[in-house]
């Protein structure tokens, strides 16, 4: 059984998180994707990895996601970035940590470098999707969809069996969080893993991230026949192998 905790950020905001404590040591911080949560295979797999390798672990659900409080349509990249930074500061304190960002989580992870420059030791990106709101959504919306979202402030999009709401404020906030023009000079281990058959986010997004990090020991791993989530047993093992290389 997985034990979840809640951290009260404000009088009305509670964030659910997974935590394995390590008083003086390195942590692994997992940041999940858009409309995801902590019930999937990745956070639990990385939690087990951390326990076996004598590491601390932290994963959280942004507001409006999973069992955290809040309404999804009130959220945006700025808010979710801030929530992640607050809970990292509260739980990890001054310990060093490795960031793992899955899909949108990689965008949130890149944003953490402005808060924790001296603490971040490495970064593992999985199907990384920075700037997806503008580049993969807004720029590809038909004219009618754009007109509807401008008029109503929201539109419901279908993706496979799911339907999710996209707000105008979310799109606009995404534009304030551009990262591809950034330059990050930290000397860290950086590995980006991307499925060759990722139908949600093209591998070029991982290539673009490599250009952001100027002094990193960096590599791109393209998983043959890999999908966007990379959540099968063998792919999770690959991710954990790459994480171990980042740590060592």
Question: Could you tell me what each predicted segment is?
Answer:
Residues 1-22:
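N-terminal cap/lid segment of alpha/beta-hydrolase-fold proteins
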Residues 35, 62-67, 130, 227:
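Alpha/beta-hydrolase active-site loop signature
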Residues 43, 47-69:
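Conserved alpha/beta-hydrolase
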Residues 66-91:
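Catalytic nucleophile-loop/oxyanion-hole region of alpha/beta-hydrolase
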Residues 101-109:
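Gly/Ala-rich beta-loop-alpha elbow adjacent to hydrolase catalytic centers
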